[in-house]
């Protein structure tokens, strides 16, 4: 009687197909953990002299009996008869301010009057205005933007006959239309409501702002409806229907119902009579134009301010650990082209803090601190410091824990592994503070017939 002999694959030993070998020690079966840690003491220092926490080399050999320099020359073998996968878990900590040159959030362009030597033919010039890198609240950011405009006036415009009332770009938080009488067309309280609402941009004729290469528009809650369309400028002519109403002159009321032409210092409000007994100022507000449903509403959209600037994503690359995903190549050492094995949002989050005494605190600060630089024109209803909002937006770096799933591993892992994190433009980021990763190998399938 012939004895049945099953195919060799059935009787082939399974022990060893899931073995993980490191020469100085006995093989492991089934699973282990591989740790990747930035700047730990067992790393070889001279390999990371010019590196940072987002692009570094780390030693994954944890043998305390072997010097780091020797352990780095060794490797970990995963049984070649099996296809291996690695469960990738990461922890990331950042210390990123919300206004930085690196992320294009500390500057914007403004079209301002630069020369009024000939009053009939003033000259307007585009200037790139920069504010210091810092972690700002929304109110402080608006103060700094206005200060940048005023500093430009003091440096350029004032030297060429430009008057204070010709400062044509103002960032504000008020709703200038509150209190407007529909019959007289004047703001009847004689003052604009001193309460913060949505961030706003106020312009004079010939002026504008350009956020093409700036994230500041995201912080102000002003965005394009077609975000991939090139360019992002806001010009005076775009703000049709957004003229700021004139104030009622209380000194002449009720004998006369006329607009207030100038402030206490003689600075004009640029009031114009558009019809008999109907006035408005030449100032135009982005928010008023948007709420009026004009042309600006078809191209722009009012959003919640993102005080982080709308930072994008973080890409993880471990080119010496994982096999390259489809469409990627391993024949590169450039961080911009390394294979990506993980992705998540940049861990800078916007937080909302409710402060019922925001304006009170602002007034106390003005009286007790030397902060007059933010309120250079307190008597001018347009150029005065805008009120702080009771809802404060702040940015916060939040440690981010991510599970990137199981991905195919190499069968041989060298003792030194490269870890690279890049931003949404595939650049190593200087604001990465701590980088941790754990890889858990496991067998996915057989790599041989037996």
UniProtKB/Swiss-Prot annotation:
It comes from the Viruses. It comes from Snake adenovirus serotype 1 (SnAdV-1). GO terms for cellular component: host cell nucleus; T=25 icosahedral viral capsid. It is found in: Virion; Host nucleus. GO terms for biological process: endocytosis involved in viral entry into host cell; virion attachment to host cell. The keyword Ribosomal protein does not apply. Keywords: Capsid protein, Host nucleus, Host-virus interaction, Late protein, T=25 icosahedral capsid protein, Viral attachment to host cell, Viral penetration into host cytoplasm, Virion, Virus endocytosis by host, Virus entry into host cell. Induction: Expressed in the late phase of the viral replicative cycle. The gene is L2. All late proteins expressed from the major late promoter are produced by alternative splicing and alternative polyadenylation of the same gene giving rise to non-overlapping ORFs. A leader sequence is present in the N-terminus of all these mRNAs and is recognized by the viral shutoff protein to provide expression although conventional translation via ribosome scanning from the cap has been shut off in the host cell. This is Penton protein. Gene3D superfamilies: adenovirus 2 penton base, domain 2 (3.90.1620.10), Penton protein, domain 1 (2.60.120.550). Pfam families: Adeno_Penton_B. Major capsid protein that self-associates to form penton base pentamers, each in the shape of a pentagon, situated at the 12 vertices of the pseudo T=25 capsid. Involved in virus secondary attachment to host cell after initial attachment by the fiber protein, and in endocytosis of virions. As the virus enters the host cell, penton proteins are shed concomitant with virion acidification in the endosome. Its main location: virion. Interacts with the fiber protein (via N-terminal tail region). Interacts with the capsid vertex protein; this interaction binds the penton base to neighboring peripentonal hexons. One of its GO terms (molecular function) is structural molecule activity. InterPro entries: Adeno_Penton_B (IPR002605).
